[in-house]
């Protein structure tokens, strides 16, 4: 029997199919690599914004869990040059700016620790619900919000199933309630969330024990001091020691981490993942890590 060549059309279809398989595999690998499952965090913090504003904090190594109770009636400081803004109108700001990561930066700044994920309605509205002594832990509703197409979130599908599992296995009594720290505005008497007071009251609550034990000293080099102060609070809130804030001698557009060791440490890995920093090896002037804040991150955290 004579051998027949496969039609060129078949080669084309096989090529397309192969490309699709590779692309799907790449997307799946990236989702797994960036997920909380792969990163193996000591603690995961999630902000739920909506009719009630709460932050859930899951202790994955110590099994100590927190629920941070927040009020829509208070004003909050929003990084990015927005200054004070009513909590209940935060969703409107996100919609106007078309930048949902404002939620992540805002809640991270509030608790002086890195908030990994956020969940918020896509359709913005103004919320007015006050703080409560015992915030409700409605696990079915929380899990539903994770998968609802009417909500926006920075979780991938693997994260959603993992976080849903964490929520499902915990009860109301498994959480320690952390209360808002409020100060009064001297001019109009408005309630303002005090980041300073909250940090003083709950310092160390959100530490990653692995980062604390690694004990790497970090220096932050900046061109914008206000951004450096905010970021240093968030980084220290993870258990990383910030030894110094200094004016930068480099102009960079993207955050850069300089480390002496060619092997990436857990501290370097955390900062790089959390703030999208590049990594380089070089002299670090007596500390373990130097973080050069670039224009991009400074404008976001100002």
What is the predicted role of each segment?
Residues 2-302:
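Non-catalytic, solvent-exposed segments at the cell envelope interface
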């Amino acid at each position: 029997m004579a051998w027949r060549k496969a039609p060129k059309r078949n080669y084309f279809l096989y090529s397309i199919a192969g490309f699709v398989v590779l692309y799907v595999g790449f997307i799946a690998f990236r989702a797994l690599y960036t997920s909380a499952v792969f990163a193996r965090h000591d603690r995961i913090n999630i902000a739920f914004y909506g009719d009630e504003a709460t932050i859930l904090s899951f202790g994955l190594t110590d099994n100590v869990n927190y629920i941070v109770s927040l009020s829509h009636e208070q004003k909050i400081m929003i990084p990015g040059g927005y200054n004070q803004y009513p909590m209940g109108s935060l969703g409107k700001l996100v919609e106007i700016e078309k930048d949902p990561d404002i939620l992540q930066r805002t809640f991270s700044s509030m608790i002086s620790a890195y908030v990994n994920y956020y969940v918020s309605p896509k359709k913005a509205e103004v919320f007015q619900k006050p703080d409560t002594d015992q915030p409700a832990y409605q696990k079915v509703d929380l899990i539903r919000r994770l998968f609802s197409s009417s909500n926006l979130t920075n979780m991938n599908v693997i994260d959603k199933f993992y976080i849903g599992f964490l929520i499902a296995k915990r009860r109301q009594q498994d959480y320690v309630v952390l209360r808002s720290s409020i100060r009064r505005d001297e001019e109009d008497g408005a309630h303002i969330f005090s980041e300073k007071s909250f940090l003083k009251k709950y310092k160390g609550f959100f530490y990653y024990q692995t980062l604390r034990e690694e004990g790497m000293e970090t220096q932050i080099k900046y061109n914008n001091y206000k951004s450096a102060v905010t970021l240093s609070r968030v980084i220290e809130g993870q258990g990383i020691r910030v030894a110094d804030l200094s004016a930068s001698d480099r102009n960079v557009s993207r955050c850069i981490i300089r480390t002496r060791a060619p092997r990436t440490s857990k501290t370097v890995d955390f900062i790089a993942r959390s703030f999208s920093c590049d990594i380089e090896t070089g002299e670090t002037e007596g500390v373990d890590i130097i973080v050069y804040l670039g224009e991009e991150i400074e404008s976001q955290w100002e």
